[in-house]
Swiss-Prot record:
Chain positions of site Reversibly protonated during proton transport: 61
Physiological role: F(1)F(0) ATP synthase produces ATP from ADP in the presence of a proton or sodium gradient. F-type ATPases consist of two structural domains, F(1) containing the extramembraneous catalytic core and F(0) containing the membrane proton channel, linked together by a central stalk and a peripheral stalk. During catalysis, ATP synthesis in the catalytic domain of F(1) is coupled via a rotary mechanism of the central stalk subunits to proton translocation. Key component of the F(0) channel; it plays a direct role in translocation across the membrane. A homomeric c-ring of between 10-14 subunits forms the central stalk rotor element with the F(1) delta and epsilon subunits.
Protein's name according to its UniProt entry: ATP synthase subunit c
Gene transcribed to yield this protein: atpE
Cell compartment(s), UniProt: Cell membrane
GO-annotated cellular components: plasma membrane; proton-transporting ATP synthase complex; proton-transporting two-sector ATPase complex, proton-transporting domain
GO molecular function: lipid binding; proton-transporting ATP synthase activity, rotational mechanism
Ranges annotated as spanning the membrane: 11-31, 54-74
Keywords for the protein's UniProt record, in alphabetical order: ATP synthesis, Cell membrane, CF(0), Hydrogen ion transport, Ion transport, Lipid-binding, Membrane, Transmembrane, Transmembrane helix, Transport
Coiled coil: none
Membrane topology listed for this record: Multi-pass membrane protein
Disulfide bonds: none
Subunit structure: F-type ATPases have 2 components, F(1) - the catalytic core - and F(0) - the membrane proton channel. F(1) has five subunits: alpha(3), beta(3), gamma(1), delta(1), epsilon(1). F(0) has three main subunits: a(1), b(2) and c(10-14). The alpha and beta chains form an alternating ring which encloses part of the gamma chain. F(1) is attached to F(0) by a central stalk formed by the gamma and epsilon chains, while a peripheral stalk is formed by the delta and b chains.
Length: 80
């Protein structure tokens, strides 16, 4: 592989991991805001909302973890 292709792989992996982190941060911020909004409107449903919040937060966090794994694979397995 020539150096231009390797440099493009480094840039692609970096952009992929960065955008995944930014997307997760925005998603968790929106999710937390909606949780607080729902808890303020109906305090009786806080246990139900909390369990749903943590399930969805785990799903939102799983996507960047997978993306970081793929990015590291590109950096260390494909580009070397």
């Amino acid at each position: 592989m020539n150096s231009l292709n390797i440099n493009l792989l480094y840039i692609a992996a970096t952009i992929m991991m960065g955008l995944a982190a930014i997307g997760a941060a925005i998603g968790i911020g929106i999710l937390g805001g909606k949780f607080l909004e729902g808890a303020a409107r109906q305090p009786d449903l806080i246990p139900l909302l909390r369990s749903q919040f943590f399930i969805v937060m785990g799903l939102v966090d799983a996507i960047p973890m997978i993306t970081v794994g793929l990015g590291l694979y590109i950096l260390f397995a494909v580009a070397s």
